[in-house]
Amino acid sequence: MPGPFSSRSFAATLPNSIAARYRKQLQKHPFLLFGLPFMATIVAGSFMLTPATALRYERYDRKNQQITQEEAMGLRQERRKVNMKDEYYRLQAKDLEDWEQRRVKRLPGEPDGTLV
């Protein structure tokens, strides 16, 4: 009975292993034993990841909902009715000739636009 250090070469055991038989068959049928499982893994992974990507986009849509123009302006049902005649008379009643020009305060170091 041979011991752990037998004189039999390592190469002599290779033709009987599963890996050696697979390598030999791979040379005869490369697509069937390598390409087809690879492509099947890619397609199966795509189907498996579809719910995860859908969840990602649903979360994004929940966060960024489309709002109407009224909601963006903060207007709800408390809006007053607008009448063009009333608005015209209201603007006519304002005194637009009594105004004073004021300079805008500038930040420190910001040019104020004057040439001095």
Swiss-Prot record:
Keywords: Membrane, Mitochondrion, Mitochondrion inner membrane, Transit peptide, Transmembrane, Transmembrane helix. The chain crosses the membrane at residues 30-50. It is found in: Mitochondrion inner membrane. The keyword Transmembrane applies. Residues 1-10 form a transit peptide. It comes from the Eukaryota. One of its GO terms (biological process) is mitochondrial cytochrome c oxidase assembly. The keyword Ligase does not apply. It is a single-pass membrane protein. One of its GO terms (cellular component) is mitochondrial inner membrane. Belongs to the COX16 family. Required for the assembly of the mitochondrial respiratory chain complex IV (CIV), also known as cytochrome c oxidase. May participate in merging the COX1 and COX2 assembly lines. This is Cytochrome c oxidase assembly protein COX16, mitochondrial. It comes from Phaeosphaeria nodorum (strain SN15 / ATCC MYA-4574 / FGSC 10173) (Glume blotch fungus).
